[in-house]
Structures are given as C-alpha cells and as structure tokens.
From Swiss-Prot:
Source organism (scientific name): Arabidopsis thaliana
Family label: Belongs to the PPR family. PCMP-H subfamily.
Gene: LOI1
Residue segments, region Type E motif: 483-558
Region annotation Type E(+) motif: where it falls in the sequence: 559-589
Gene Ontology cellular component annotations, sorted alphabetically: mitochondrion
Molecular function GO labels: mRNA binding; nucleotide binding; poly(G) binding; zinc ion binding
Record protein name field: Pentatricopeptide repeat-containing protein At4g14850
The keyword Repeat is annotated on this UniProt entry: yes
NCBIfam families: PPR
Amino acid sequence: MSLLSADALGLLLKNAISASSMRLGRVVHARIVKTLDSPPPPFLANYLINMYSKLDHPESARLVLRLTPARNVVSWTSLISGLAQNGHFSTALVEFFEMRREGVVPNDFTFPCAFKAVASLRLPVTGKQIHALAVKCGRILDVFVGCSAFDMYCKTRLRDDARKLFDEIPERNLETWNAFISNSVTDGRPREAIEAFIEFRRIDGHPNSITFCAFLNACSDWLHLNLGMQLHGLVLRSGFDTDVSVCNGLIDFYGKCKQIRSSEIIFTEMGTKNAVSWCSLVAAYVQNHEDEKASVLYLRSRKDIVETSDFMISSVLSACAGMAGLELGRSIHAHAVKACVERTIFVGSALVDMYGKCGCIEDSEQAFDEMPEKNLVTRNSLIGGYAHQGQVDMALALFEEMAPRGCGPTPNYMTFVSLLSACSRAGAVENGMKIFDSMRSTYGIEPGAEHYSCIVDMLGRAGMVERAYEFIKKMPIQPTISVWGALQNACRMHGKPQLGLLAAENLFKLDPKDSGNHVLLSNTFAAAGRWAEANTVREELKGVGIKKGAGYSWITVKNQVHAFQAKDRSHILNKEIQTTLAKLRNEMEAAGYKPDLKLSLYDLEEEEKAAEVSHHSEKLALAFGLLSLPLSVPIRITKNLRICGDCHSFFKFVSGSVKREIIVRDNNRFHRFKDGICSCKDYW
C-alpha cells in the first residue's frame, strides 16, 4: 500500500463506492493520511468527499470538505450530490447556499442536485431563486439543468412556469420528454401527456422503457383502450416486449381498461418476472372483481418466494374484502405483521377496509387505532365499515373529527357516499338530507350519481317512495342505473307496482340486458299479488334470451368454502342439512312462525310457496353452519344477491331459538342476527 500513487488511491475510493464498502473507504482514507502530505491533493480530497457522501456518511463528508483549503465546485458538488441522493434534502440546500457564500459558482452538475432537493421539499420560492441563479450563470440552457428545473416546477405545482420552461429548452433530449410526460401523468393531466408523446413521435423521437411506462399510465388514467393497444404494437416493433417494466405497465393498463385476459396473457408470456409483475396482476384482478383469482395468485407468489411489498398485501386484502374472505384476510394480516408492514398507510387502510367488509367492525376499529398515521382513505374505510353495519352514529362521530369541524383531513366525494349509505341503512332520513345539503354549501363538493342514489334509497327504505320519485325528477344530472334501481327496489318493498314499472322502463333503456332489472320488476308485481304480470315479465326475460344470474350463498368452515344454490341437494351432508332445516321449521311453526310468502315468485298454492322459500341457498348454508361450527363461533354467510324477506325472518327466529350469532353479508349490507334481532332493524 505504501507504494500506491495518489491516482491509485483515488481509484480505490471509486471502488469503495461501487462496492458500497465503507470499510474499504476508511482503510484507503487512513492510508492517505498516513502516506501523503496534509492536506491531500484537491482531487483526492474530492474523491473522499464523494465517497463519504455517496455512502451516506454526511458528517464525515462535511468534515473532509471543511479541512480542504482548496475546495472548489467539484468538492461542493460531490457533497451536495451525495446528500440529495441519500434523501438529506434540507442539508443539501444548506450546503448549496454555503457554497454560494464562499463565492463558488455552481456548475451543470450542482444545479440538478439543488433542484432535486427543492422538488422533494416542495419549496417553490427557493426553486425560483435557484432558477434565476442558473439563468444568471448561463447554465439553464444546458439540457440536464433545464430538465431538472422543469421537474422541480412540476413537483412544486407551478404548472405555468413548468410549461414555459419546457418551451424555452432549445434542445430537448429523451430525458426532458420523459420528465414532461411523466409529470403530466402524475399531475392528473393524462391528455397532455398523450399529446406530448404524439409530438415526441412526430419529431422522430425514440421512446425508451420510461417513455412507454409513462404513456401507458396516461392511457390507463384516461381509460383509452385503443390508444394503449396501438402503443402495445409500437412496443412490439421497438423490441421492448421483453422489458420487465414495460410488461408490468401493460398488465396494469389492460387491467384498468377491463381487459383482464390480456393482462393474464402478458404475465404468462413474460420470460422474467419481478415482484412488481405479480403485484400488478393481483391488483388487476381486484380492479376487475376477480377476487378469488387475486387470492390464488398471491398464494402462488408466496410459494415462488416472491418478495412481498405493502402494495401486494394491500391489494390482496382488498380481494379478501370483496369476497368476505375473513380467514384468508386474517392469515394475510399475520403475514403483514411478520413482514413489519402492517402499520404502513396502505396495509393499515386495507386492514380497516377488509375487517369492516367482513363484518368484524371491532377488528376494523382496532386496526384503525393501531395505525401511527392515518389519512383520508383510512377514515373513509372505517366510515364505510360503519355504513355496512348501519351504525350511523359511529360514522357521524368519525365524520365530526374531520375538517372543517375537527382537525382531521377534509372529507371527499367517497366520504359522503359512505355517510349517506349509513344514513340510508339506518333510516336516518333527517341526518341524511342535512349531510347531502352540506356537500355543496359547506364542503364545495358537487354531488354525483352515487350520492343521489343513496338519497333515493334512503327515502325509499323509509317508505317515502313518492318523495323519492320527486327527488329524482329534480336531479340536475341524468338519473343512472343505481338511482332507478333504488327506486324500483323501494317500490317492491312498499307495494308500488305502477311506479315500479316506470322505474323498470327507465332501467331497461339504460341496461336492457341486465336480468336483475327484470327480476326486480317481477318481484314487485309478485309482492302486490299481481301474479299474471309477474309471470309475463319472467316470460319476456326468457324470450329475449337474457338469463337470470344464479343466487349463491357460501360459508367457510376449516379453511374450506362450501357454496350452495337454492334447492341444492349435492352437498355431502345434504341429508343432515335437510333434517336440520325440517327440525327448525317445525320448532318455529310451533312457536307461531309463518313463512313470508309475499315475494314468492309464482302463483302457487300456499304449501308450494312454503316449499319454494324453505330451500333458499342462505338457509342451506345456515343449516350447514349449525352442523359444522362450534357454539362459540359466529356463523358467517355470504350471499351474492339480496337476502329475501322470509330468510331474514327465519334467521332472526333461529338466532333467538338456538342462541347463535349469525352474520350475513348480502350484495347490499351486513345483517348481524343475535337474540332474535337483526342489526339492520329491518331496513334493507
């Protein structure tokens, strides 16, 4: 070592950076101190400053700088660059201005580091000052300086300044165009990003993987399927179809555009996959409501030892929430704890949402309370959980903590959807109308179709069907399927067939192929005893070739899902299930229970109607749960359609008769049956 020259020592310091070896760096520094004159040559001092700052030892880097009498712009830039690279943005700016106090002029490498620090700290005024200095020093025309200044303006939300600077850059390179396109997407301006890409191609620009990914994000945000497919063709022609990041972008794009089969094909044909690839397809499945596939893929990724991220876990927790997969959700929660990501904002919010949608509101509250940091999504998730349970008082209490009344975040569009849904399910008409009116007057939020639908649903549940119709007629926007559907359901519940027919006609115009609309109208006529019209609607449904979606109920026992259909006799325990149901019916009839036959769909004799409703899928699932689950465990049933009136009455009676807690999640809300009472208070 004693024979090593200064150049060789400098090379060793570069190797220390490449190998991320602080030990090697310190050994070389010790050799420099021992063998060379003090202070070392300026270029060697600069190597030392660069090594310490890049390896995230800022104090050592600053000390070497202070002990170097002949420090120059390279010395300062080495320090500032390393500080910015390692996230010490405030310190980087302090050193930048200290350099200026010493009269050192920044160069083409110093300015980008300073702009990066300003962008990260969101300091627009400081950014403008440094921009002015770059102009004064004649550096702003450098493509790298100009690009970093442009990026700074974008990240500090100074759009006009960013656009002006972009137009003034004389020679835009690929990085400049990438910065423009990427920042336009990040800033919520996908159309501008697409227009920039088209202009870039017009001047014969050649995109790289960053360009392709940014453009795909723009197409995803704008849901522009055709344009994205054209880009996919360009990806193939340009040879980027083997690039992992581009393939990941394509998976995400097709998923958001509801082309999940295309996402699957790209994933399957990828030669090399990374953790983002798996995560992208899981998220795509969730976005397309294919929750079971998302869960299966997640379990496959665990077997393949794919690195787990907080985004992956939050995505699969959303899948568990969608299919009410409580057991799987709990196991993923345990994995999140093991991976030390359960308290991140993404995973924490997903846990709050998952437990709320699985009917475990206490677990949802606990996950919420244990989060060190909460944002608007977290609060909306808990309010949504309360809404599913019809706990309007708890939802309103959490809402009161938000701005402007409280110190929490300001409510947004989705906050009010959950609040109004809670009011609807609890029958809190007065509160619901006050909240709806406050959206514009207090919060400046324009109500959307979901909010109007909640109000119609709320009024309809409360029996104010005519008022709900008058509300629809006064809507400033065109009523949607959900609005007319809420009115039609209210007509079914309260025996208003003529108004129900009007709602159905509007539904048929908006979505003529949805079998649910025809079934609901048929039920409305059946509830009013107008059997001929009910059967006519059913026959029309068959005549146009529209098939009614099958109703399913399922229950999980010992990590195995058991699914049932109405009149299903295929289960291995069918004999025991039928015996249990018959026994329960006999006990209940002896106690005065009579089946609710008003919504039986056919003009049958009373005995036939009773047989019709006695084998609904949720009753079969309940009987199986009573046979299979211990007394201390609640019976949790999920149904893909709304629970019928007779099953609702049956479940209330059973919960009191056998002293079991029964939790049913249908396609509308949760029902917690206990001691003969339902949490919905018969509003559903």
